[in-house]
Every structure is written in C-alpha cells, then in structure tokens.
Amino acid sequence: MAGHDSGNARRGRASFGAFVRKPVERDSVANAGQAAEQGSPEATQAWPDDAVEVGAVVDAYGLKGWVKVATHADAGRGGDALLNARRWWLERGAERLSVRIMQSKTHSDTVVAQPAGVSDRDAALSMRGFRVFVRREDFPALAADEFYWVDLIGLEVVNEQSVALGKVSGMIDNGVHSIMRVEYPATGKDGQPTTDERLIPFVGVYVKTVDQAARRIVVDWEADY
C-alpha cells in the first residue's frame, strides 16, 4: 500500500506475508525449476530467521501429488508469496519440514502446488494441516511507496508533533482501504496498567512517512482523536 497515495488503498490484504500487488488472478504456472531437480520433504530443525507464515495446506489437488493451500491473503495478491518462493517451510505441531516446490499456480481463491517428492494423492493428503512459511527475502519486490503488512507490524507511530501514539499491532482491510491497529499503554478503570488501541487509516492523507530503517511511521493524527 502506498503511504502517500490514497488511491492505492485497496492493495494490502492480510496480516501474514501480506502483499500489495495488483488484484489480478494469476493463471500462469510459476515453475520452481527443472523437473530433474528432485527431492522429498525433509525433516528439519533449522528454521529461517525471516520465515513468515502465509497459509496452510488444506487438501490435495488432483491425483499427482499437488497440494491445495488456503492463503492468508487473496490469491493473486498475498498468494504471490507462495508463487514466488522456490522452497516452503512447513510446520504441524512439533513436526517441521522443508520442501522444494516444483510448480505452483492460483486456483480460485487458493494456491495449488507440486512439492518435490510428493507423487500421488495419498502423499498430498498426508500433508494436510501443515502451516506454510516462506522466507521474507523470497517475497516479490514492491514498487516505491508500497509496503507489506508484515513489515509494518511493530513500527512506532508518532504524529507530526513527535507525540508517540503507540506501535502497530496489526492491520485491517475494511474493503476500501487498510487501517493500522495502533496499541498504546493506558490505565484501566481499576487504575491498573492496560493497553488501548487507535485505528488509523493507512492512506496518504494521514500517513506522511514510513521509515522502515528507523522503524517509525509519521502520521497526521492527534492523540485525542
């Protein structure tokens, strides 16, 4: 989503691996490599430091070892993370796997993929329930003034008078534009410390700068709004 352009407000879609891509369904197959690049899902304890959860395996697709993934962002938007990554990291309870993806494509509102070494429907069905992660470095590059929601979480929010408003705890898509959920410390009715929340539209009229290096967002917003 563009921090300076309210016309880009519909681009972000989800809080995990969230994309800001154009809302066009991808029908073409994204090839993960040559068919000769073989291998099977491998148990692993090593886990990428930049792993981001982007979906979950919900079913098999067809008879030849393809899996169906419900994405945390609409296919063709957030689903692009799955299409772009050549390796997925899977987690189900205490079980962790690393798998190379041979092919992937969108299918309706899901992403379907062929993991290396998974050759039939039964093997694909055995993968149901795995949460799917990809490395943040595998996300497609964005245009200027576009941001992944996952990169906004945790950033400090201040107004133009340098008054601290809190930190981004999450994002909401209301169908028109994205909204930042900004948590800040407060005092409850019982006098005990608690947290409260501000909802700030993530559109150019309010969001003035997003400095990811400084982990700060400057907004035109007052503390008593």
From Swiss-Prot:
Localization of this protein: Cytoplasm
A Pfam family matched in the record: RimM
Domain PRC barrel residue range list: 144-225
Main location: cytoplasm
Thylakoid is among the record's keywords: no
GO molecular function: ribosome binding
GO BP, one annotated term: ribosomal small subunit biogenesis
Keywords recorded for this protein, A-Z: Chaperone, Cytoplasm, Ribosome biogenesis, rRNA processing
GO cellular component: cytoplasm; ribosome
InterPro entries: PRC_barrel-like_sf (IPR011033), PRC_RimM (IPR056792), RimM (IPR011961), RimM_N (IPR002676), RimM_N_sf (IPR036976), Transl_B-barrel_sf (IPR009000)
Entry domain remark: The PRC barrel domain binds ribosomal protein uS19.
Record family assignment: Belongs to the RimM family.
Summary of subunit composition and partner proteins: Binds ribosomal protein uS19.
Function description: An accessory protein needed during the final step in the assembly of 30S ribosomal subunit, possibly for assembly of the head region. Essential for efficient processing of 16S rRNA. May be needed both before and after RbfA during the maturation of 16S rRNA. It has affinity for free ribosomal 30S subunits but not for 70S ribosomes.
Protein's recorded name: Ribosome maturation factor RimM
